[in-house]
Amino acid sequence: MIEFAKTNDKNELSSLWQMTFLEDSKVIEYFFNNVLKDVVTPVIKIDGEIASSLFLLPCKIGEYKGMCVYCAMTKYSHRGKGYMKELLDFSYNYCLEKGFDFLFLVPAEESLFDYYEKCGFNEFGISRRIILDATIPENKERLNYQYKIDFDSSIIDYWKNCCVVYGGEITDFGLVSRDDETVIRNAKGDFIEIPQDYKKEKTIIQGDISFGEEYTPAMIRTENKELLELDCYIGITLE
């Protein structure tokens, strides 16, 4: 039976998260202390213990409201029993009941695309982008043809914290670099870590044209066909 996690489920959820994703304990602790209050956490319990769970993060795509599936996880001993599909169906129906338009996720690995398709999701291409200054005309033009997938501030702060834990840097502009996904500019205007593909275009980058784009195949479940046609990006706009 599906229920919503309670405060006393924190330790069990934390252990399942670490076991499933080998996540740093600092990241998990930050999430539970600063983000959990803003998310919905459906769980399936078997014999009083959590067998499967996921987090639902509120988000928006333009005027459309929805939820993002995060940390979908099932104990090894309970995999293959259909629990995650039950949770995903429950989550989608929950979205509809609350008046939301979609349920969104980014599969952790390529092998999961077929699985999520069977659960009613469609592939939904997005790009990861960092816009250094949205007030500059060229950047505004770049933003006009795409919809930003936006999250609550507590969730954004959590992802910033993740980058710090895994070796990124926070600047006064508020965003970080992690691996080659993003680039940042510090408070003095100096660039920190420019991806190889963009090094030849440093003059363009210094002109504040948006950059740091990377196509990410995501998936979305929705009754709204217009959403399937949107060109979207996920990232932070530094204004």
Predicted regions and their residues:
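A conserved beta-strand-loop-helix scaffold within acyl/acetyltransferase catalytic domains
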Residues: 4, 10-73, 159-199
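Conserved acetyl-CoA-binding loop-helix of GNAT-fold acetyltransferases
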Residues: 74, 80-93
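Conserved active-site alpha-helix within GNAT-family acetyltransferase domains
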Residues: 101-102, 108-127, 212-220
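Amide-forming acyltransferase catalytic core, primarily the GNAT-like/NAT-type
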Residues: 96, 119-197
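Short coil/turn motifs at secondary-structure junctions
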Residues: 59-61, 77, 110-112
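Extended terminal accessory/targeting regions
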Residues: 192, 200-213
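Conserved GNAT acetyl-CoA-binding A-motif
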Residues: 95-108, 202-206
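C-terminal functional modules
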Residues: 207-239
